[in-house]
Amino acid sequence: MKKHILICGEKGVGKSTLIRRLVEEARLTVGGFCTKMDENAEGAMRPIYIYPASLPTDQRKRGMENLVGRCGNFGRQKEIFPEAFNALGTAYLQGTSSCQVIVMDELGFMESDAQAFRRAVLQTLDGETPVLAAVKNRMDVGFLRQGGGNP
């Protein structure tokens, strides 16, 4: 019986921190993805990058190839690159066959036009490997409800 944990909440409440600590404490083999906004970037639009969940923070590189979007003005302004989710996000989810837990940090509104990635998320949730996911607490993250039997 699969057991997934989806942690929902507003920005800054500690969803990602909780996931990181749970994985570290349990010493699990991890697959999946993490997205992270570059808070130190200059300009009004902050870049957001996607990384393999297994990659240590100090080894994460930022470049156009893993740029999934830019946000500004508390999410009211956004520029999203669904092709990065479709290519990298999907690959990170499909490469999880030997993992003990799949991390999805985080799921939100930015994936709305990334159809291949959304399908990969739903397929992962239909799988047997436990998922630990951070989910933005927003009305426009409805694609997770499409999965029928998914949590």
What are these regions (language model features)?
Residues 15:
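Conserved lysine of the Walker
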Residues 11:
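The conserved Walker
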Residues 7:
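Hydrophobic anchor at the beta1->P-loop junction of P-loop NTPases
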Residues 70-122:
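Phosphate-binding/switch loop-helix module in NTP-utilizing enzymes
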Residues 1-4:
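Extreme N-terminal starter segment of soluble prokaryotic enzymes
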Residues 25-26, 95-96, 127:
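Alpha-helix C-cap/termination motif
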Residues 20-74:
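N-terminal phosphate/diphosphate-binding loop that engages ATP/GTP or pyrophosphate donors
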